[in-house]
């Protein structure tokens, strides 16, 4: 039987950061992703030493292994707007510092949108921004993980080459990794719904990034192949198909990569539980139901 990779969900921290581990344990997670602050605000409330200590203790005491964080959606490292770029750099630096205090290993961030300036200019700005942020935190043991995108508008990251180019330009590429989202890849035109397309995509990703591939977002897609629209669906309820997820979970090259689902807003826990059950069922053999007659036979034999 194929062993599952570290598998879990993006869990809420409503009620305090440590509640993430309570939700994770209820879902049977062995990996999670969280927000370390409100993702729709530039600044968050101060993280106290006591909060950080309790988070680390809860992590150490439970079944969760890798913990990732997702950076604010407001951050745009690729913009030509100098004021917005500086604000984005400051926000990313702040989240990086929070992750370090909490013991979070990877901080996922979208590369950003060039807003008409062109891909080359945008990629150069992202790399320069990462250099600025990382230079101010030379000893922080947190890797920034660039996430691929669906390719909406002028967003960078719809092709793996963009992420590789950014990493090639930064001064310390070992501190910059990659997190790949299945919905985004499918929407951007990578045929992961087909066996050959899936093999091609993951082989290319591993060739370009190797061990720098440090996270996977397992999301189905509401929109059809190549739509360039980012709309997540529950696993098996979208356009990608269960086969693609089975191939990912059973790929020995990805066995150590933490993978999380990102259910759309709603009944988060119920959605996560269902998605994770579906994913586990693609790898773990289902236990046959015992028939009443079977139980009777066993009972007779025990007399």
Task: Place the predicted regions along the sequence by residue.
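Conserved, mostly hydrophobic/aromatic
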Residues: 24, 70, 88, 99, ...
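Acidic (Asp/Glu)-rich catalytic clusters
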Residues: 2, 22-29, 47-68, 93-103, ...
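N-terminal pre-domain/capping segments
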Residues: 1-71, 75, 79-96, 285-292
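Active-site acidic/histidine proton-transfer and metal-coordination neighborhood
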Residues: 77-177
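Gly/Pro-rich active-site loop or hairpin
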Residues: 86, 156-164, 186-256, 270-273
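Active-site beta-loop-alpha junctions enriched in small/polar residues
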Residues: 10-14, 37-39, 71-74, 112-114, ...
